[in-house]
From Swiss-Prot:
Catalyzes the irreversible NADPH-dependent deamination of GMP to IMP. It functions in the conversion of nucleobase, nucleoside and nucleotide derivatives of G to A nucleotides, and in maintaining the intracellular balance of A and G nucleotides. It comes from Vibrio campbellii (strain ATCC BAA-1116). Belongs to the IMPDH/GMPR family. GuaC type 1 subfamily. This is GMP reductase. The active site is at C186. The keyword Metal-binding applies. It catalyses: IMP + NH4(+) + NADP(+) = GMP + NADPH + 2 H(+).
Length: 347
């Protein structure tokens, strides 16, 4: 047993230090990034925010809506191959280029991924997603998928430390997904005692990945636009959002009416709700590691994504970053014990 003494930080522990800026307006800030990925050699241009691959977030409808903003969607893995074929026939090229095909690591998952990727050459992203990215099986699976799809962009995770980040990149991942337990409907840290404060995980994994020419996705922990900006400032190349994009008409969640008001069900992908729906219940050897909540129905996602991107643009103006790419270079975090003034409630 050993104890690491260094304090690790989450988004709530810091604020940006403002800096002198020549920018006159948020409209001058360019949030588009141009990436060339390490293994596939693929190029991609867009706003590096990703809707999470959760049942009630990463839907085909969400993908079509967010593509209008240049934003990506990691489509959840529970659509059938036939569903994907129909989607490919109804979506434009920009939408297809901005979706990630999510998969687990079983033999059935591998075959399904091959079937989906064969539908359209416009599918360029594969998201290999398991809860515990420290499994040797994941490394082997990444190698297998890389061999099968040498020209596709592969994301793999989730991990929170630089050593495993490096191992996944060396195995063939272009992007590593970073985050264990920070999500709004995740209870892994409570059920297992395992986790890592998300900002420190992003800083450390970003440093490791960038040293090898890889990239990272900061997955989870964002509750407001300021947190998204902090993730980018800490070195995330992409930021994945679940709860912030849940509850919208495009989210694909179950709508429930109570007392004349509409709510949408939102749950973690290791929750009892998810396992009841997809796995025939919680297996006898495991515990559910997610919550199920009812969110007030929020209407269209377009207003929400504009608000998030507007907040990030505003961050850039405060620190003098004309491009999102410059934000991490312009970032100085100050440690704090307060965030917003809650006299009139939380924003």
């Amino acid at each position: 047993m050993r104890i690491e003494q260094e304090l690790k930080l989450g988004f709530k522990d810091v604020l940006f230090r403002p800096k002198r800026s020549t920018l006159k307006s948020r409209s001058q800030v360019n949030l588009t990034r141009d990436f060339t990925f390490k293994h596939s050699g693929r190029q991609w241009s867009g706003v590096p925010v990703i809707a999470a691959n959760m049942d009630s977030v990463g839907s085909f409808a969400m993908a079509k809506a967010l593509a209008e903003h240049g934003v990506m969607t990691a489509v959840h893995k529970h659509y059938t191959v036939e569903d994907w074929a129909e989607f490919a026939n109804t979506a434009d090229k920009a939408t297809l280029n901005n979706v990630m095909v999510s998969t687990g690591t079983s033999e059935a998952d591998f075959q399904k991924t091959k079937d989906i990727m064969a539908i359209s050459d416009e599918f360029i992203f594969i998201c290999i997603d398991i809860a515990n990215g420290y499994s040797e099986h994941l490394v082997e699976y990444v190698q297998r998928v890389r061999a099968a799809f040498p020209d596709k962009v592969i994301s793999a995770g989730n991990v929170v430390t630089g050593d495993m980040c490096e191992e996944l990149i060396l195995a063939g991942a272009d992007i590593v997904k970073v985050g264990i337990g920070p999500g709004s409907v995740c209870t892994t840290r409570v059920k297992t005692g395992v986790g890592y404060p998300q900002l420190s995980a992003i800083i450390e994994c970003g440093d490791a990945a960038h040293g090898l020419g890889g990239m990272i996705i900061g997955d989870g922990g964002c509750s407001c636009a300021g947190d998204v900006a902090k993730a980018f400032g800490g070195g995330a190349d992409f930021v994945m959002l679940g709860g912030m994009l849940a509850g919208h008409e495009e989210s694909g969640g179950e709508v429930i009416e109570q007392d004349g008001k509409q709510f949408m069900k939102f749950y973690g992908m290791s929750s009892k709700s998810a396992m009841d729906k997809h796995s025939g219940g919680v297996a006898g050897y495991r515990a559910a590691e997610g919550k199920t909540v009812l969110l007030p129905f929020r209407g269209s996602v377009h207003g929400t994504i504009q608000d998030i991107l507007g907040g990030v643009r505003s961050t850039c103006t405060y620190v003098g970053a004309a491009k999102l790419k410059e934000l991490t270079k312009r970032t100085t975090f100050i440690r704090v014990q307060e965030q917003e003034n809650n006299v009139f409630g939380k924003e």
